[in-house]
Amino acid sequence: MIEEEIEVDVDIKTRADKFHKFIRRSQHVPKATHYIKGCDLLEGEWGKVGSILLWKLVFDGEPRVSKDMIEVIDEEKNVIQLRVLEGPLKKEYKSFLKTMKVMSPKHGGPGSVVKWNMKYERIDQNVDHPNRLLQFFVEVTKEIDQYLLSKD
């Protein structure tokens, strides 16, 4: 199989730096969305490359966990990249990499754009592309945006 990729842009009202900073502090994300029930630090330090996180979430109405390693944090470009190490995704994908980049809007103005990108290699052709997971991240992003706006 070959590595494949899907992505989506989500327009938000929160500034790019503020959104990125909040996501980087993963332990606070469960406060902002009902989809994420917890995030535990298993190894390393919060918000540092090489750290391993255990996400507890609700996906398609079912509780799930995902053990991820932070591979990239770029404060200047507002990028965070996580590699899935363990969890349900590893049963269907040989590799799975999630990248979030927060940018200023293309046409200027307030707010920002969150680009979610997923690179993955399916175990076989019978495994679906992760479109539902991409939509999950759209919903999580919108809820976090609303939470951050309510804190201004």
From Swiss-Prot:
Species of the source: Arabidopsis thaliana (Mouse-ear cress)
Any one Gene Ontology BP term: defense response
Pfam family, one: Bet_v_1
Protein name, as recorded: MLP-like protein 165
Family: Belongs to the MLP family.
InterPro entries: Bet_v_I/MLP, MLP-like_ligand-binding, START-like_dom_sf
Gene encoding the protein: MLP165
